[in-house]
């Protein structure tokens, strides 16, 4: 793991190399690149010295044998001389046809894929459960079947093995409780 300070020093080192390469290209008669404002690079020491209350800048420590694996890219893009900046900055996802239009991979709807998976494992999904025989004859036991795909670990909240959302959540499902046995209040009578 590379420390934040070492990462900042390595980023500073890369910027210094870039500016040195840009200056060399300008001195050799090649196209000179504009100097980028690099926040961590001190072009000249301050004539007044360090600010009061601030420690003077330490020289960079020698590099150790540690390596950065997958370091995040710099926020400012510094291009080397000879690289063209005309590349498109918009990432293209998905395969393209010769006409340049994107091809969408066919996706099955969630409800269809769930139904097909459920039909394939129908025999394994139904588990017989004996619910309180209450002294009945064992030969006359009736088995109640429920699908084991719903977790019953949330008892007593999932007593019917029907989740309100989560497993087969759909955005247009209305999860509010409706009471059909209560007649609506007659507001005219209440106000009088």
Swiss-Prot record:
Superkingdom of the organism of origin: Eukaryota
Locations listed in the record: Cytoplasm, Cytoskeleton, Flagellum axoneme
UniProt family annotation: Belongs to the CIMIP3-like family.
The UniProt record lists the keyword Iron-sulfur: no
Stretches of the chain forming a coiled coil according to its record: none
Primary localisation category: cytoplasm
InterPro entries: CIMIP3-like
Tissue: Detected in the sperm flagellum (at protein level).
Alphabetized Pfam families for the sequence: CIMIP3
Keywords: Cell projection, Cilium, Cytoplasm, Cytoskeleton, Flagellum
Biased composition (Basic residues): 55-64
Name assigned to this protein: Ciliary microtubule inner protein 3
Region (Disordered): 24-108
Keyword Cytoplasm in annotation: yes
């Amino acid at each position: 793991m590379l420390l934040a300070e070492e990462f900042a020093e390595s980023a500073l080192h890369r910027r210094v190399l870039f500016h040195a390469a840009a200056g060399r290209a300008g001195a050799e008669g090649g196209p000179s690149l504009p100097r980028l404002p690099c926040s961590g690079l001190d072009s000249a020491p301050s004539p007044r010295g360090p600010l009061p209350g601030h420690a003077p800048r330490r020289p960079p420590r020698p590099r150790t044998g540690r390596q950065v694996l997958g370091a995040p890219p710099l926020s400012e893009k510094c291009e080397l001389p000879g690289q063209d900046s005309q590349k498109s900055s918009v990432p293209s996802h998905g395969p393209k046809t010769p006409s340049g239009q994107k091809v969408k991979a066919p996706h099955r709807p969630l409800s269809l894929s769930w139904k097909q998976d459920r039909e394939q494992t129908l025999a394994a999904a139904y588990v017989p459960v004996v619910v309180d025989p209450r002294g009945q004859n064992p030969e006359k036991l009736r088995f109640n079947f429920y699908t084991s795909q719903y977790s019953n670990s949330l008892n007593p909240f999932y007593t019917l093995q029907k989740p309100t959302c989560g497993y087969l959540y759909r955005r247009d499902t209305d999860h509010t409780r409706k009471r059909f046995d209560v007649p609506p209040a007659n507001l005219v009578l209440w106000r009088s």
